[in-house]
Amino acid sequence: MRIGYGFDSHEFRAGIPLKIGGVELPHAKGLGGHSDGDVLLHAITDALLGAIAAPDIGVLFPPSDPKWKGADSAVFLREALDRVARSGYRVSNIDSSLILAAPKIGPHSADIRGRVAKLLGIDCSCVGLKAKTPEGLNLENAAVAHVVVLLEQTSLSTKIPASPKVREKRGTRTGNNAGPIKNKKKR
């Protein structure tokens, strides 16, 4: 099992649609960002990437790259899921918290959970979503998302990195000291 944590925040801006969890919500302002500004999908993506120790969303999809201007955040999520699968894991469940003053998420919660579940390929009962108001935190013009994801191995045949002692017995190392271990002469 692996656990990942993701966080994202965006400022509200006039003249753009509001997307949260892949669902367009009725609101006077949307969330600014280089892509579509979907704060929840961005946090989920980073949680998935973090769980497998992969580079974060900003490294894989840099805001400096015009290719990602206005991109659907589901593209980022699909790439993260592909990396998770290639690492031998799948999503077991996620839990998320949204912090924003408006709009109220309650009326849209089922739609958001359903869309996220579909994107992740899991049952809706495995997607937790809570919405909180910022109450005195001066966040009336922003939205924040926190996400925790639990991954499980897809099969027992998935390779798990050996412990340092096992690698030493095999005569190999990983990380900064990668390469074969030279036999030490006994004195």
Predicted features by range, described:
Residues 1-112, 119-120:
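RNase III-family endoribonuclease catalytic core
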Residues 96-100, 129, 145-149:
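A structural signal for short, well-ordered beta-strand segments
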Residues 137-156:
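C-terminal edge-of-domain segments
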Residues 167-187:
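Intrinsically disordered, Lys/Arg-rich low-complexity segments
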